[in-house]
């Protein structure tokens, strides 16, 4: 009771199913690579031990092959396909290697180009670095110079500020001095106005004094008959620009001299007549006022001064003798009144009483 067995040999081929076997075998590697997977029934030789010539009717119907088509046709087609299939991977490998070689060449060319470009860029970078260093050095030098200049400018600025502050202080001091001067000027102007008022007042007083002086001069004119422009103190007797004063106080010669000195005068001296040295010529106004009963101390004459002995032991006084006044010698310690003499003085500003 053995059953019949049909064997199917399945082969997977990336070839589109064509009606013509020649078209299938003539496709290039690209069609081979881009095809779809299909299944194809292949006639195999019968298995040993099995009944020859047996085949499944279903398989024969699927293959679409008539019973009258010989089996040898499938065998030849299968053999030709099997011979053509191994050639496609070799061609692809060659193309792959060729593409890989081209890629390597292109990569090498790119590497060389990149190397050349790198060298160019490196040289440019070095050149740029040198230029940058030179520029940086120049800029640093310029910066140092600018910093030095700025330092000098700062010193000059500080000096200028100090000078400005000093000038401002000087200006303020000058302004204060100017203000003080203005205040002093105002004070001087006020003082000037006040002085003008005082001067005006003094002028009025001077005119009043002139009037009073004129009145006084007219009053004094009554008491003086001398026509000279000199005068003597009140109580003194004027005579030829001299003033005489009669003292009624008794005293020695020395005391009389001191008394006359206290009156800013001296003992009177009278000229001697040419005939008699003892005679005395007295002014008429003075002689009338003398007391004839008394003697008066006077200054020693020139002739009597020549005798030093008589000067040291005796002094001169005058007295009346037979109605005339004569000089006589007496002891200096005797007590007698005296006659003082002084220079007459002029009126102020040369004013004459006449």
UniProtKB/Swiss-Prot annotation:
Sorted UniProt keywords: Disulfide bond, Glycoprotein, Lectin, Membrane, Phosphoprotein, Receptor, Signal-anchor, Transmembrane, Transmembrane helix
**Chain segments annotated as transmembrane:** 96-116
In what tissue types does this protein appear? Answer: Pre-B-cells and B-cells but not terminally differentiated plasma cells.
Domain C-type lectin stretches? 231-342
| Organism superkingdom | Eukaryota
PTM (free text): Phosphorylated upon engagement of the B-cell receptor, probably by LYN or SYK. Phosphorylation at Tyr-7 is important for interaction with PTPN6/SHP-1.
- What does gene deletion cause? Cd72 deficiency affects the development and the functional activation of B-cells. The most prominent effects on B-cell development are visible at the transition from the immature to mature B-cell stage.
Its membrane topology is listed as:
Single-pass type II membrane protein
Carbohydrate-modified residues: 136
What Gene Ontology terms describe what this protein does at the molecular function level?
A: carbohydrate binding; transmembrane signaling receptor activity
Q: Which residues carry this modification: Phosphotyrosine?
A: 7, 39
Residue ranges that the UniProt entry lists as topological domain Cytoplasmic: 1-95
- SS bond partners: 232-243, 260-340, 315-332
Name where it mostly resides: membrane
Q: Which SMART domains match?
A: CLECT
Q: Where in the cell is it found?
A: Membrane
Purpose of the protein: Co-receptor of B cell receptor (BCR) that plays both positive and negative roles on B-cell functions. Recognizes the Sm/ribonucleoprotein (RNP) self-antigen ligand, and coligation of CD72 and BCR inhibits BCR signaling. Mechanistically, ligand binding leads to the recruitment of PTPN6/SHP-1 to the BCR complex which is inhibitory to BCR signaling. Acts also as a ligand for CD5 and thereby plays a critical role in maintaining regulatory T and B-cell homeostasis.
What this protein is called in its record is: B-cell differentiation antigen CD72
Source organism per UniProt: Mus musculus (Mouse)
- Tell me the lineage of the source organism: Eukaryota, Metazoa, Chordata, Craniata, Vertebrata
């Amino acid at each position: 009771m053995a059953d019949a067995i049909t064997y199917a040999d399945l082969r997977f081929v990336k070839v589109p199913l064509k009606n013509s076997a020649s078209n299938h075998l003539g496709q290039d590697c690209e069609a081979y690579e881009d095809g779809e997977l299909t299944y194809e029934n292949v006639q195999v030789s019968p298995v040993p031990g099995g009944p020859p010539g047996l085949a499944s009717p279903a398989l024969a119907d699927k293959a679409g092959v008539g019973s009258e088509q010989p089996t040898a046709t499938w065998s030849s087609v299968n053999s030709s396909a099997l011979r053509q299939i191994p050639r496609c991977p070799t061609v692809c490998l060659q193309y792959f290697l060729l593409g890989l070689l081209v890629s390597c060449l292109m990569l090498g060319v790119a590497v060389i180009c990149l190397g050349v470009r790198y060298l160019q860029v490196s040289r440019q970078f070095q050149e740029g670095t040198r230029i940058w260093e030179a520029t940086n050095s120049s800029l640093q030098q310029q910066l140092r110079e600018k910093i030095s200049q700025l330092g000098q400018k700062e010193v000059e600025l500080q000096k200028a500020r100090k000078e400005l502050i000093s000038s401002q202080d000087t200006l303020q001091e000058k302004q204060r001095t100017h203000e003080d001067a203005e205040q002093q000027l105002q004070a001087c102007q006020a003082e000037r106005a006040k002085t003008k008022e005082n001067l005006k007042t003094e002028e009025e007083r001077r005119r009043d004094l002139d009037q009073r002086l004129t009145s006084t001069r007219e009053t004094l004119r009554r008491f003086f008959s001398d026509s000279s422009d000199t005068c003597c103190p009140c109580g003194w007797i004027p005579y030829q620009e001299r003033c005489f004063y009669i003292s009624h106080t008794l005293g020695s010669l020395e005391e009389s001299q001191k008394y006359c000195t206290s009156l800013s005068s001296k003992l009177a001296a009278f000229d001697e007549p040419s005939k008699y040295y003892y005679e005395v010529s007295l002014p008429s106004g003075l002689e009338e006022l003398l007391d004839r009963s008394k003697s008066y101390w006077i200054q020693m004459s020139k002739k009597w001064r020549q005798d030093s002995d008589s000067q040291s032991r005796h002094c001169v006084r005058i007295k009346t003798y037979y109605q005339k006044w004569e000089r006589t010698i007496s002891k200096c310690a005797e007590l007698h009144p005296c006659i003082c003499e002084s220079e007459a003085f002029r009126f102020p500003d040369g004013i004459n009483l006449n």
